[in-house]
Amino acid sequence: MPTINQLIKKPRKSQKEKTASPALQNCPQRRGICTRVMTVTPKKPNSALRKVARVRLSNGFEVTAYIPGIGHNLQEHSVVLIRGGRVKDLPGVRYHIIRGAKDTLGVNNRKQGRSKYGTKKPKA
């Protein structure tokens, strides 16, 4: 426990708040170019082939982003828009690709939760 005099000489440092998505640099989304599209396997109790992409962002960061939904059209050099949001069972994946923006198409035959997957309203 420091004395009052010690605190006058050297005050306490306020703790910096850590951000969950540092590559966005306080922006809601960032544009990037896919450098690699691949599948990865999740952590222990789960089993699947999750679709992810390595993305070089417009600010120079290179991040791994998850591709949500069933099926996608992404390949190398596709331009994508990413947002924050981690995938709990994929270590190191802290970003999501936004479906229906830039080169990413929306999910086909999606009826519910369409706004999250960039799908247009079906014709009645």
Swiss-Prot record:
Keywords: Methylation, Ribonucleoprotein, Ribosomal protein, RNA-binding, rRNA-binding, tRNA-binding. The modification 3-methylthioaspartic acid is found at residue 89. Gene3D superfamilies: Nucleic acid-binding proteins (2.40.50.140). GO terms for cellular component: small ribosomal subunit. One of its GO terms (molecular function) is tRNA binding. Residues 1-24 are annotated as: Disordered. The keyword RNA-binding applies. GO terms for biological process: translation. HAMAP family: Ribosomal_uS12_B (MF_00403_B). Belongs to the universal ribosomal protein uS12 family. Part of the 30S ribosomal subunit. Contacts proteins S8 and S17. May interact with IF1 in the 30S initiation complex. With S4 and S5 plays an important role in translational accuracy. Interacts with and stabilizes bases of the 16S rRNA that are involved in tRNA selection in the A site and with the mRNA backbone. Located at the interface of the 30S and 50S subunits, it traverses the body of the 30S subunit contacting proteins on the other side and probably holding the rRNA structure together. The combined cluster of proteins S8, S12 and S17 appears to hold together the shoulder and platform of the 30S subunit. This is Small ribosomal subunit protein uS12. It comes from Borrelia hermsii (strain HS1 / DAH). The lineage of its organism: Bacteria, Pseudomonadati, Spirochaetota, Spirochaetia, Spirochaetales.
